[in-house]
């Protein structure tokens, strides 16, 4: 009779023989809000989550599209509110303390470590050294940590520096894309089973392909494969006053965010987030368009209608919805997942939910 395979012995032997081996699943347990409910939902499938620890997230876009606003501002602020220590790596020499404080970031040494470095090798050495010390700590003493790199596109290779010093700028011959890929690949493997995450920004350039008009992310495609979440951003002008009325002056930007890659929701979904210069972003920005696009908010004349799960009808003008009057958008978020799940269920599986579906789509008689 054949001897049965001993899984527990195999698990114990392989754990001893391979240093740093992680066994089992490492699903994210800690999520950090982007500061915007609609973007949180498109990234993670939950309005209150956002980007996870243990993974690498990339915000890529043109200059002034709001990458640093989200990565170095909102996400850092949300992380600190959850007791997560932040290591902020500034490769652009552009993050001023006054600007970070204006966004609500705590710049004290106990909450934030800001590093200014420009070499890819230096960033890799910093992350590697940190993780060695981190793994040496007992399980109960390991803090939650978030690395923010702003940005990948501005980092240099030793070849860049040597050529600059010699006055012979030939280019790095493809070394930078390979170095960035290696950086992200190693980071993903190091962070996987720990409460340590990374958020990066990167630059984009216009596509020359008429059949693929989406902006291209600089630095090659290798690090995109290793990233769990990639958000592409474009900058549009915001010509609205505080009441939402159209004006000719530019009062801010509209950040067009498209989730190019995510492992937690549907990819290629997009939302426009308004970021006024004076007041900053409203966390509910883009939520009305998201709910309307899924059919949960329906037009009735010049107003928008929503039927809650407890059969309460909410009928308001668009501006009232955008201002979240009477907590109307909070009610939409509360019922969003429940109603969307019913609407997307195959017909043969919704016998018990037919009444709910009819109520969601019911139009009042005139």
Description of each model-found segment:
Residues 86, 146, 198:
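Hydrophobic "anchor" residues on beta-strands that sit immediately upstream
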Residues 173-294:
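Phosphate-binding/switch region of NTP-binding enzymes
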Residues 108-121, 227:
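A glycine-rich helix N-cap at a beta->alpha junction
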Residues 95, 155-156, 207-208:
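Catalytic P-loop NTPase motifs of RecA-like helicase/translocase cores
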Residues 1-22, 32, 238-366:
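C-terminal regions of RecA-like/P-loop NTPase motor modules
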Residues 2-110, 125-132:
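The Walker A/P-loop phosphate-binding site
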Residues 81, 103-110, 163-173, 215-220:
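A short alpha->loop->secondary-structure connector
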Residues 118-195:
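Phosphate-binding/switch loop-helix module in NTP-utilizing enzymes
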């Amino acid at each position: 009779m054949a001897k049965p395979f001993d899984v527990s012995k195999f698990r114990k032997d392989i754990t001893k023989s391979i240093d740093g081996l992680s066994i089992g699943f490492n699903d994210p347990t800690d999520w950090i809000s982007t500061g915007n409910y609609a973007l949180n939902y498109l990234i993670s499938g939950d309005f209150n989550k956002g980007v996870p620890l243990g993974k690498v997230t990339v915000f890529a876009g043109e200059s002034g599209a709001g990458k640093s606003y989200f990565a170095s501002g909102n996400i850092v602020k949300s992380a600190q509110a959850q007791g997560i220590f932040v290591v902020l790596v500034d490769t652009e020499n552009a993050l001023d303390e006054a600007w970070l404080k204006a966004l609500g970031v705590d710049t004290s040494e106990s909450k934030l470590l800001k590093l200014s470095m420009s070499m890819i090798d230096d960033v890799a050495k910093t992350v590697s050294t940190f993780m060695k010390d981190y793994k040496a700590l007992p399980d109960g003493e390991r803090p939650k940590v978030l690395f923010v790199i702003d940005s990948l596109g501005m980092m240099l290779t030793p070849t860049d520096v040597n050529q600059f010093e010699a006055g012979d700028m030939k280019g790095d011959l493809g070394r930078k894309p390979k170095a960035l890929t290696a950086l992200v690949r190693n980071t993903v493997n190091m962070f996987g089973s720990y409460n340590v995450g990374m958020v990066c920004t990167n630059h984009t350039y216009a596509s020359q392909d008429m059949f693929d008009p989406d902006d291209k992310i600089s630095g090659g495609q290798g690090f995109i494969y290793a990233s769990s979440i990639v958000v592409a951003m474009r900058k549009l002008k915001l010509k609205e006053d505080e009441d939402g009325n159209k004006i000719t002056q530019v009062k801010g930007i509209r950040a067009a965010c498209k989730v190019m890659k995510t492992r937690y929701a549907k990819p290629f979904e997009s939302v426009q987030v308004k970021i006024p210069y004076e007041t900053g972003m409203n966390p509910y920005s883009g939520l009305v368009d998201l709910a309307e696009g899924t059919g949960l908010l329906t037009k009735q004349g010049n107003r928008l209608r929503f039927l809650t799960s407890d059969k309460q009808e909410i009928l308001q003008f668009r501006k009232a919805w955008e201002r979240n009057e009477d907590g109307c958008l909070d009610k939409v978020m509360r019922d969003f997942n429940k109603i969307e799940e019913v609407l997307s269920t195959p017909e043969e599986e919704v016998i018990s939910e037919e009444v709910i579906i009819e109520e969601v789509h019911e139009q009042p008689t005139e």
